[in-house]
Amino acid sequence: MLKRSKFETTQSQIMHRAEDLISAASNRYRITVQVANRAKRRRYEEFESAEDAMMKPVLRAIIEMSDELTQPEIIGEI
């Protein structure tokens, strides 16, 4: 029996996004550290706001960073 994900993104989509991030980066170590730092920051933000996180911080960081890579208008200038 397969366990269904609560999210619209599947494991294969997340792996594809992670591969895109690594291939676009000039330094694999640096992008890995950036993903880890963003996940750590998001984890503490969610902990302080007492929200019930449905998605693990690392997965959320990979999705956010890959979206920023593929859709630069998300970042935009304020």
Swiss-Prot record:
Gene Ontology terms, MF aspect: DNA binding; DNA-directed RNA polymerase activity
InterPro entries associated with the record: DNA-dir_RNA_pol_omega, Pol_omega/Rpo6/RPB6, RPB6/omega-like_sf
GO biological process: one example: DNA-templated transcription
Any single GO CC term annotated in Swiss-Prot or TrEMBL for this entry: DNA-directed RNA polymerase complex
Catalytic function, reaction form: RNA(n) + a ribonucleoside 5'-triphosphate = RNA(n+1) + diphosphate
This enzyme's EC code(s): 2.7.7.6
Keyword check for Secreted: no
Oligomer status and interactors: In cyanobacteria the RNAP catalytic core is composed of 2 alpha, 1 beta, 1 beta', 1 gamma and 1 omega subunit. When a sigma factor is associated with the core the holoenzyme is formed, which can initiate transcription.
Family to which the UniProt record says this protein belongs: Belongs to the RNA polymerase subunit omega family.
Role: Promotes RNA polymerase assembly. Latches the N- and C-terminal regions of the beta' subunit thereby facilitating its interaction with the beta and alpha subunits.
Protein name as it appears in the record: DNA-directed RNA polymerase subunit omega
Originating organism: Nostoc sp. (strain PCC 7120 / SAG 25.82 / UTEX 2576)
